[in-house]
Amino acid sequence: MNIHEYQGKEILRKYNVPVPRGIPAFSVAEALKAAEELGGPVWVVKAQIHAGGRGKGGGVKVAKSIDDVKTYATNILGMQLVTHQTGPEGKKVNRLLIEEGADIKKELYVSLVVDRVSQKIALMASSEGGMDIEEVAAHTPEKIHTLIIEPSTGLTDADADDIARKIGVPDASVAQARQALQGLYKAFYDTDASLAEINPLILTGEGKVIALDAKFNFDSNALFRHPEIVAYRDLDEEDANEIEASKFDLAYISLDGNIGCLVNGAGLAMATMDTIKLFGGEPANFLDVGGGATTEKVTEAFKLMLKNPNVEAILVNIFGGIMRCDVIAEGVISASKAVNLTVPLVVRMKGTNEDLGKKMLADSGLPIIAADTMEEAAQKVVAAAAGKK
């Protein structure tokens, strides 16, 4: 789950990480009121969407008068903001952050992620803040410093000070940087975040350390114990189909292809998508129905896939372990009839009650294309989708 910058800064503030004074605004009138409350002489008008690159896309403006605030708020609110992370369709801006200006002397970068290799927390920091860390990694990787943190120990004073000095924090500001780094770490750990990023973390002309931006991603599997994080959820920023899928306990992610995929198990779903691509096809979605799929669940899964007008064929790939193949067959038959399926459907089933499931499909009278192996299923669905063009 992602949250907005201003929400991330609320979290940082709770952990004593210095952030600029700022007020969220949902209208031009609220933006003007916020600017007046903050006082001048400089304000920053920032679009709030779940994507990076807002500045380059025209979503961050420095205002030097109240009239500027009004102009920028009017232009940004409601705009379809396109960045390198949104795709060409962009995202509509429904809220702003009006923030006091900052005296930027130096921009730094710091982030925390879960490192799957070490199974610990990795802190990454760089003297090259204010730009995409991917660019730094590609062109000047030596400027990225990584520290693997043992969760039982946490981020020690010595390690925090060492990282601060490595990224160019002067001695007079190291104590402030330590406070910011340890606060970020504590926020990351306490909230079950999967990513916490400050870009940039700035040094001001007076030597102050301030988090000028904040990005958090949270582990959705841990949200049950963080109602305060769930309260930050902005459904306008999420895919409508993914929201609908969550109501039926379906793991669904929209993609750009034309072949719908219905699979049980995330690993098999990924392998299915890879195999489709291997034979020249493009998946239209990731869809894991899990181990407890019912007829209703399968029907809803079909409905979700077919809401995408680009879907020209569907592949159902099921391994019957916990999930019985005859139950899936019943769901596929019922779903095909319920949605009046008109696109080609390829079904591959292996495992528990496989023969019964296959017989049910064969006796259904529906034009279902059977496949025995994953490679055969992928080839058939790619060919079927090509035949629809």
From Swiss-Prot:
The keyword NADP does not apply. It holds the Pfam family Ligase_CoA. Pathway: Carbohydrate metabolism; tricarboxylic acid cycle; succinate from succinyl-CoA (ligase route): step 1/1. Keywords: ATP-binding, Ligase, Magnesium, Metal-binding, Nucleotide-binding, Tricarboxylic acid cycle. Residues 9-244 form the ATP-grasp domain. It catalyses: succinate + ATP + CoA = succinyl-CoA + ADP + phosphate; GTP + succinate + CoA = succinyl-CoA + GDP + phosphate. Belongs to the succinate/malate CoA ligase beta subunit family. NCBIfam families: PRK00696.1, sucCoAbeta. This is Succinate--CoA ligase [ADP-forming] subunit beta. It comes from Cupriavidus pinatubonensis (strain JMP 134 / LMG 1197).
